[in-house]
UniProtKB/Swiss-Prot annotation:
Residues 1-19 have a biased composition (Low complexity). Binds 3 Mg(2+) ions per subunit. Keywords: Magnesium, Metal-binding, Transferase. Chevalone E derivatives produced by this cluster are interesting candidates for cancer therapy since they synergistically enhance the cytotoxicity of doxorubicin (DOX) in both MDA-MB-231 and MCF-7 breast cancer cell lines. Dimethylallyl diphosphate binds at residues 150, 229-230, 263, 270, 280, 290. One of its GO terms (biological process) is mycotoxin biosynthetic process. The lineage of its organism: Eukaryota, Fungi, Dikarya, Ascomycota, Pezizomycotina. It catalyses: isopentenyl diphosphate + dimethylallyl diphosphate = (2E)-geranyl diphosphate + diphosphate; isopentenyl diphosphate + (2E)-geranyl diphosphate = (2E,6E)-farnesyl diphosphate + diphosphate; isopentenyl diphosphate + (2E,6E)-farnesyl diphosphate = (2E,6E,10E)-geranylgeranyl diphosphate + diphosphate. The gene is cle6. Mg(2+) 2 binds at residues 141, 145. This is Geranylgeranyl pyrophosphate synthase cle6. GO terms for molecular function: metal ion binding; prenyltransferase activity. Mg(2+) 1 binds at residues 141, 145. Residues 45-55 have a biased composition (Polar residues).
Amino acid sequence: MHSVRTSTTSTSSMVSSTMHPFDAFNAPQPYQQHHPPRWNIHNPHFSQTNGHSIQKTPSMIKLHSSEGTVPTTNGADTLHQRNMEEKIISAPLHYITGLPGKDIRGKLISAFNEWFRIPDEQLEIIKRVVGLLHVASLLIDDIEDSSKLRRGFPVAHSIFGIPQTINSANYAYFQAQSEVLKLRNCNAAFTIFTEELLRLHRGQGMDLYWRDSLTCPTEEEYLDMVANKTGGLFRLAIKLIQLESDVEDDCVPLVDLLGIIFQIRDDYQNLQNEQYAKNKGFAEDITEGKFSYPIVHSIRSGAANCSSGSSELMNILRQKTDDEAVKRYTICILEKTGSFEYTRRKLTELMAAARAMLAEFGSAEAAGLGGILDFLELKE
């Protein structure tokens, strides 16, 4: 023990207060163990450098160690590796984009550009941004909603697993962010991108909270949530287009209205449309326990009239049932409370307001948007 203390004291005296800090690393260290170099010499073609050797081949560089060969690929192999990784990471995204769909958002962007007339290069960037965010949101929504089908096919996480699907969706968010930085007014575009994604997640958060806490929102609260959630990508697209355009018209109010129309129409079709049932499953919103627009109306109107249907609806939503008989009974409750009729009237009212807004612009270039509104009309 005495000799140990002596050795330590001796070393300390060599690293004096006047020594440059980095010189301390060169001072003798107590109990320092010397090991042979980690990398062994196997290549006769190169001279030794500090006990290391490197073997070079046309396709790769190999470092030989006691634990095996560690390859470091050259440029061509690195590119191939990156491409393979990209395919793996993006597989859930590519799966969803490969499913049949109407691309309503892409068509909407093209329709708005009929009068904003931004360059094709900028337009394609905006389409990629919105497309990536849309597909990412579908991947996450299907997980959060425990969905089984997407456009008539198994949801992505049923094929790739939940962790890989979440990672792929997150990857798409940052791919979209990198695309935004390619726009001419990239600083302002990045601010818009951030603001709208925050609004989208606030809306989604409230939708999930109401469902999981079994809290029925008011109609006003519901519409505010939809404006944030569903209107987010519509609004992001038009704000970026307006930012890149010399045309000074403000179409954000119209886009907000279109987002609400789109979501209420989707809620209605989830419970009433046979084709929707084939693509997503019969009355999936009931299985999810979601407070969709017709259900909010039925519960609120039933509570006001002291109807037993209101409490029955709440109990059914709590079950998150997949029983078709129970779901058909739920639809009967909605019919009795006039909730489907109320939803149709609301859509007619909103559609008229949207057409009036469109007419105010008085532009022949708005024909494409008129076609979008025609598509959104309910077909009974």
